[in-house]
Each structure stands twice: as C-alpha cells, then as structure tokens.
Amino acid sequence: ARDGYIANDRNCVYTCALNPYCDSECKKNGADSGYCQWFGRFGNACWCKNLPDKVPIRIPGECRG
C-alpha cells in the first residue's frame, strides 16, 4: 500500500471540493482515509493514505480523460 492521488483508469485524479467525498472514495477503494488536497499539483484532488497497490494512483503523463 502507498499514499497518493487516487486516479481512474485514464490516469485522471478525482476532482474534489470537500474532504468527506475523498475520505469515502478512498475508503471504498481500501485506503485508511483520504482528504481533498486543495491547489495541489493536479488542482483540487483526492489524496488517499495507505491505498492498496492494486488501485491506480496518478502517475507522470497525461490525464487521458
């Protein structure tokens, strides 16, 4: 498991405004918790703590959304 910006299968982050949304999305995918990182590298995006390795995180390269 690792911490990171949770991403969909197109390498796009989950855009957010509120922490509860991210906490819920992260936990739904097996993470311990999550929050909305404002004005981060990818704008306002969900950051997950201890996300299982099988769940994609944002990697270098384009968001293909």
Swiss-Prot record:
S-S bonds: 12-63, 16-36, 22-46, 26-48
Residue positions, PTM Arginine amide: 64
Domain called LCN-type CS-alpha/beta: residue spans: 2-64
Pfam families noted in UniProt: Toxin_3
Tissues in which the protein is found: Expressed by the venom gland.
SMART domains in UniProt: Knot1 (SM00505)
UniProt entry keywords in alphabetical sequence: Amidation, Disulfide bond, Ion channel impairing toxin, Neurotoxin, Secreted, Toxin, Voltage-gated sodium channel impairing toxin
Record has Manganese as a keyword: no
Predominant subcellular localization, coarse grouping: secreted
Localization terms from the record: Secreted
Gene3D superfamilies: Knottin, scorpion toxin-like (3.30.30.10)
Any one GO BP annotation for this protein: defense response
GO cellular component: extracellular region
Source species, domain of life: Eukaryota
A Gene Ontology molecular function term of the record: sodium channel inhibitor activity
Family: Belongs to the long (4 C-C) scorpion toxin superfamily. Sodium channel inhibitor family. Alpha subfamily.
Swiss-Prot/TrEMBL domain comment: Has the structural arrangement of an alpha-helix connected to antiparallel beta-sheets by disulfide bonds (CS-alpha/beta).
Annotated function: Alpha toxins bind voltage-independently at site-3 of sodium channels (Nav) and inhibit the inactivation of the activated channels, thereby blocking neuronal transmission.
Protein name, as recorded: Sodium channel neurotoxin MeuNaTxalpha-9
Species of provenance: Mesobuthus eupeus
